[in-house]
Amino acid sequence: MARDEVRRILPADIKREVLIKDEKAETNPKWGFPPEKRPMEMHMQFGIINLDKPPGPTSHEVVAWVKKLFNLNKAGHGGTLDPKVSGVLPVALERATRVVQALLPAGKEYVALMHLHGEVPEDKIYAVMKEFEGEIIQRPPLRSAVKRRLRTRKVYYIEILEIDGKDVLFRAGVEAGTYIRSLIHHIGLALGVGAHMAELRRTRSGPFKEDETLVTLHDLVDYYHFWKEDGIEEYFRKAIQPMEKAVEHLPKVWIRDSAVAAVTHGADLAVPGIVKVHKGIKKGDLVAVMTLKDELVALGKATMTSGEMLQKSKGIAVDVDKVFMPRDWYPKLW
């Protein structure tokens, strides 16, 4: 990694071209609930919080607090953070809980403080850390909840932010499931002095970043009480992102109004229901099925390429896995 500017690009940053199959297709404004028009209760039912996890509690404890605070039946988080680690923890609520699956291919970003066990010239630190970009082989730590099998993970970029003696502050963009503690251990071995992780903070989980949407638990308590006790929903609404935020990075297939109810009732997506698609979809890709109002209908696996979806007139294009939209948002038209 040269000392010039590092291109910080995760899979979530890939721009996709939209290919149109039916230019005349329209959507009925009377049907559905676009993200920006959902009533507050509904917004919460189909929402996801970009939560700033504090160091101390486990990710599961944080989610349990959110459930109790909002009196929810279900909630889930995207990517466990160890108790001592702080930062971006997407927490999906109620009907949106299963959408965290969509964050797996999006990539994550961390800022870590590595403490070296000996003096190393700065040029060597830069050169050695550069070698850890790309495919690496890792074994989960002893305390990990998963089996300790060797596995490959991708490091998209490493950017050194500051070197102060034996302390190296750096930013890393990585594939989901990459252990930063293990990465630092192996960097230390490669430098010939050893190293350990002193601090870690997650700064991105796919489309969720350290930006104006990031909220603390204290913020949530205040905003929730503003809404419930004073009737001021503005702050609480901004603290909860629509579930569609969690699929921003996924390739998408947009469908006509007449196909929505069939999918919400359990049907796979057939070609006649498609209006437009993202370019570059491959068979087996995880895709988001959307309405023409950009509402998330479902997640599924593509059984055709983008080209086949455009060219064919029949057949199943998406094997639907998880449905998020309620069955009564669009009428049955079959």
For each of these PLM feature ranges, what is it?
Residues 70, 74-103:
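Glycine/acidic-rich beta-strand-loop module
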Residues 78-87, 107-109, 141-147:
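Short, glycine/charge-rich beta-strand/loop segments that flank catalytic centers
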Residues 146-177, 181-182, 186:
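The conserved catalytic core of RNA pseudouridine synthases
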